[in-house]
Amino acid sequence: MDETLLVAGPLDVARTLSRYRAWGEDPANRLTDGAFRRAIRVDGGWRAYELTWSGGPDDAKLRVSVPGARRARVLDATLAEVRRLCGLDLDVASFYRAAAADPVLAALVPRLYGLRPTLVPEPFEMLVGAVCAQQVNLTFAFTVRARLVRRYGTPVRGNGATVYAFPEPAVLARARVGDLRRMQLTVRKGEYIVGVARQIVSGALDLSRLAAGSNEDVVEMLTAIRGLGRWTAEWFLARCLGRGDVCPAGDLAVRKAFAHFYNRGRALSERAIRRRAARWGEHQNLAVHYLLAGQRLHAERAGGGS
């Protein structure tokens, strides 16, 4: 079963999805030249799907293929997930109009035109990924996460390729911390991941409540769990729930980007970053992603990689 999505507003698909291989392999989100593959759970079973695209940022077309799907709800669920992965419901056009008043963002928009933040489809996947990324660089975080996905995820075949479904909470709730340690997760990170999984399985952490809560409610619920700090909670708000008025000001990469673009390389306090970001209102999430992408462009030109 195939479907074509016409995109309203600018979308640079390749740039938007590039994070899925910018720092290494992601077996749950396989990006190759011109194709993206992932697995989705529908009606109690896993389905692999493929996303391909054509056109430029102003006339992008997305083609979604779900082999063997015979029910409309399978395709509907897949299309909804693709919308999240490509950030299609984010108001980029409004952000561009607002960015014109900020010299830094106004200069970045033409260079990054059509970039949209990807939204992680599954809350548990987002939380585990955030724990893996704590206090390490993203290349190492992706390496460790890939090992975890291959060990505990479910291989799903489709479109001539295999993609791994991200491990479910019930599976990681039974994982041994020692086994996670052998994947080069620290003991504490292993404990955090198993702990979050067990909270979800037991019902102590209700993921549906997170989507319905205010920003501060979400921060309060997540930071009450061992191993999840405000940094993790704010990235969850930004990259899973798609909240616009969020700036993960404590994140090291965010702090470096603000220092580079707004303070001649000198560090800014978390409070100062939040104060500046507040000027962008509902566009904070998009602004932060453009600053981070702009910082990576600068590093690449300077020969510093990502």
Predicted regions and their residues:
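HhH-family (HhH-GPD) DNA N-glycosylase catalytic core used in base-excision repair
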Residues: 1-306
